[in-house]
Swiss-Prot record:
Keywords, ordered alphabetically: Amino-acid biosynthesis, ATP-binding, Cytoplasm, Histidine biosynthesis, Hydrolase, Nucleotide-binding
Record's protein name: Phosphoribosyl-ATP pyrophosphatase
Organism from which the protein derives: Thermobifida fusca (strain YX)
Catalysed reactions listed for this entry: 1-(5-phospho-beta-D-ribosyl)-ATP + H2O = 1-(5-phospho-beta-D-ribosyl)-5'-AMP + diphosphate + H(+)
Pfam families in UniProt: PRA-PH (PF01503)
Keyword set includes Nucleotide-binding: yes
């Protein structure tokens, strides 16, 4: 199990080191438009899971949405502090 901050640190490191075969690197290379489409897709899956699936499945979908949001943040050069400032 990892925290939101730990995930962001891990993804930031992957963005920096660009390991071969990394899903994160592939998404970053695809660009903001492709990542944004994935965020929208995952948000819809969260909604559907919340409506029709178990808490476990909903939590899994939320974790995937958070992952893609963080990848989008990295693609835009945003830090956690940039977002926290608006919470």
């Amino acid at each position: 199990m990892k925290t939101f901050e730990e995930l962001f640190t891990e993804l930031s490191e992957k963005a920096r080191t660009r390991p071969a075969g990394s899903r994160t690197v592939a998404q970053l290379d695809a660009g903001v438009h492709a990542i944004g489409k994935k965020v929208v897709e995952e948000a819809a899956e969260v909604w559907m899971a919340a409506e029709y699936q178990s808490d476990e499945e909903t939590a899994e979908e939320i974790s995937q949405l958070l992952y893609h949001v963080q990848v989008l943040m990295l693609a835009r050069g945003l830090r956690l502090e940039d977002v926290y400032r608006h919470l």
